[in-house]
Regions:
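Active-site and ligand/interface coordination hotspots across diverse enzymes
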Residues: 1-59
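Short acidic (Asp/Glu) patches
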Residues: 30, 59-66, 97-106
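Short, conserved, surface-exposed binding loops centered on an aromatic residue
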Residues: 35-37, 70-71, 109-112
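Catalytic metal-binding/acid-base residues of hydrolase active sites
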Residues: 49, 83, 125
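A short mixed-secondary-structure module that forms the rim of ligand-binding clefts
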Residues: 51-73
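Short connector loops at secondary-structure junctions
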Residues: 75-91
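Glycine/proline-rich loop-helix segments at beta-alpha junctions forming the active-site rim
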Residues: 87, 93-129
Length: 129
């Protein structure tokens, strides 16, 4: 995703390199990646919509994703979402004029190609799509 309407941010979080790709207004997060072992397999999660996790800090959901990836001996994980709109409440996300985000399909496909395994984890609210 090398476009001028995205912002890519990096951070070293403990043993993990972290990268987040946002829209230029940062109301959308297209992907969040953590890598702690470049040689190991990579796990891709597709979830509902981003909450508060950033390149610097996990939210509770992303923390669970990281723990699962580490427990299953993956060396990295990436989170993409069926809606890129950042909100802690799925009901509010549904009120957004454009909850998917212009570059979200590209981010999901990129994540599927990047990961060795993809987990669909968007729950019941995904029927809104």
């Amino acid at each position: 995703m090398k476009r001028k309407n995205v912002v890519t941010k990096y951070h070293q979080k403990g043993d993990a390199k972290s990268k987040a790709i946002y829209s230029d207004c940062e109301k959308y997060r297209y992907s969040l990646t953590r890598i702690w072992n470049e040689e190991a397999k990579k796990l891709h999660f597709i979830m509902l919509n981003p909450s508060t996790a950033t390149e610097i800090q996990n939210d509770p959901t992303v923390e669970r994703c990281e723990r699962r990836a580490r427990t299953l001996n993956f060396g990295a994980f990436r989170v993409t979402n069926i809606f890129a709109w950042r909100d802690t409440d799925p009901k509010k996300m549904k009120c957004a004029i454009e909850p998917i985000g212009l570059l979200n399909d590209e981010a999901i496909l990129s994540g599927c190609n990047w990961g060795d395994c993809t987990i669909a984890a968007w729950g019941n609210h995904g029927i809104y799509l």
